[in-house]
Amino acid sequence: MKRTYQPSKLVRKRRHGFRARMATAGGRKVIAARRAHGRKRLSA
């Protein structure tokens, strides 16, 4: 059986990167919440 996690830097950036987050209203809320929490890393 193939494992579910097949790492790819490109797919990781496209799905969870900063620009992907900023592209949607929900994603912007995620960034805002992480900023409010004082996260060192906001996105992948």
UniProtKB/Swiss-Prot annotation:
Domain of life: Bacteria
Keywords for the protein's UniProt record, in alphabetical order: Ribonucleoprotein, Ribosomal protein
GO biological process: translation
GO cellular component: ribonucleoprotein complex; ribosome
GO molecular function: structural constituent of ribosome
Alphabetized PROSITE patterns for the sequence: RIBOSOMAL_L34 (PS00784)
PANTHER family linked to this entry: LARGE RIBOSOMAL SUBUNIT PROTEIN BL34M, MITOCHONDRIAL RIBOSOMAL PROTEIN 34 FAMILY MEMBER
Xref: HAMAP family: Ribosomal_bL34 (MF_00391)
Protein name as annotated: Large ribosomal subunit protein bL34
Species the sequence originates in: Methylorubrum extorquens (strain PA1)
Gene name of the record: rpmH
